[in-house]
Amino acid sequence: MSEKIISVAVSGYFDPIHVGHLDYLEHAKKLGDKLIVIVNNNHQCVLKKGKPFMDELDRVRIVKSLDMVDEVFLSVDSDRSVCKSLEEIKPDIFANGGDRFESDSPESGICKKFKIKMVDGLGEKIRSSSSLTGLKEIK
């Protein structure tokens, strides 16, 4: 009988991708066997910062090319969360980056519902995409 493959999901805008994202993805990959990256869609970028710096399909293509990534999933959500995407994927683990924690995560409810383990604080907050592009997050 074969062992269960542990799937780890992470999410991000990757707009643009930077070294902090790579650190986050490398740490997440170590948590399981299969790394699934949810890339936030263009609509979510508009909600966060007014407009995407890069198109969602370009961001998906770049993330797919990374060695540590096993699968890329374009977010199906219409708000800033990835709750619906997690409901579709149903990974074993949902990992947040260094600047996100379960206590402030909109995904915590869906993770409890589907018994998805949450892991927080992966990688350091080295820099932000908005600091690279000059685009500011909309609060």
Regions from the language model: what does each represent?
Residues M1-K139:
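Nucleotidyltransferase catalytic core that binds NTPs
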